[in-house]
Amino acid sequence: MEEVINGILIREVETKNIMTKSSLPVGGYSVNPYVGCTHACKYCYASFMKRFTGHKEEWGTFLDVKHWPEIKNPKKYAGQRVVIGSVTDGYNPQEEQFGNTRKLLEQLIGSDADILICTKSDLVVRDIDLLKKLGRVTVSWSINTLGENFKNDMDSASSIERRISAMKQVYEAGIRTVCFVSPVFPGITDFEAIFERVKDQCDLFWLENLNLRGGFKKTIMDYIAGKYPDLVPLYDEIYNKHNRSYFEALEVKAEKMAKKYDCAFVDNEMPYGRVPQGHPVIVDYFYHEEIRGTENTGKRNR
């Protein structure tokens, strides 16, 4: 099936196996119920997928709905990290129609896998009933601003307020939550203000710097020049001259914030667990691809 719905090219495709061994630092499996993502984030690293999928359409304007053989032995994934949404958002608006992510969660019940769901949507609230049955599950929302105007410039996903509301509902349902402050835009993202909003409803507060590579570097640099011209020298220093002092200063700032609020300050995710309300673990993930190892220890590898 192929059709255009609300300006999005929708295809239904067959796949032999929905579970893919992951190359992510956390290991385990990467699971993407869709190909493509209709949030159309301007800074999305996943847009590189077009090189492998053969899509000619602009990123954010297409979505392949996967069909896969039922997972009949979920126990096979016991103890494994399963990341849902590494190069898509399983809770994109089309999930409401096709239900692929809910079907996947139903098939993983009883797996005893360590499941991480990455999203920018509040639709995940629909599946709280399943999340409770899965046990070791974490839901992470990307929130890098409290300003809806900047958010709207960057993506077409759920509003910031809806994401924060969803995080609260999931947290209060007893499910581990993450506020993923990513990407941190220099001079724009105020992570302390975000922390104040979410500290009582998340277990992890994760910081990651904006990486500019590939085709979207020009997109972002042009956006900054047009909307934030006073920040052009800073972005030139960071992304053309590769000066790291700005993010090094943010690391110091984040560590001071951790001490102020009596929060653990680590360089990678700690093993699965909950923390006292109001004291989320603060994860310093700046430049992680260069200085972090593959072990999920919570310690920096130098």
Each model region followed by its residue ranges:
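Conserved Radical SAM active-site core
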Residues: 1-138, 146-150, 160-161, 172
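Auxiliary Fe-S-binding modules of radical SAM enzymes
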Residues: 2-14, 192-302
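Hydrophobic faces of well-ordered beta-strands that scaffold small-molecule active sites
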Residues: 29, 82, 115, 139-141, ...
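Active-site beta-loop-alpha junctions enriched in small/polar residues
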Residues: 87-89, 120-122, 142-146, 182-184, ...
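Generic structural signal for well-ordered alpha-helices
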Residues: 102-105, 128, 163-167, 191-195, ...
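Surface-exposed amphipathic alpha-helices with a cationic face
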Residues: 109, 132, 165-174, 255-259
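Glycine-enriched alpha-helix->loop->beta-strand junction motifs that scaffold or abut catalytic
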Residues: 133-139, 199-204
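Conserved strand-turn element in the central/C-terminal portion of the radical SAM core barrel
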Residues: 156, 168-189, 240-244
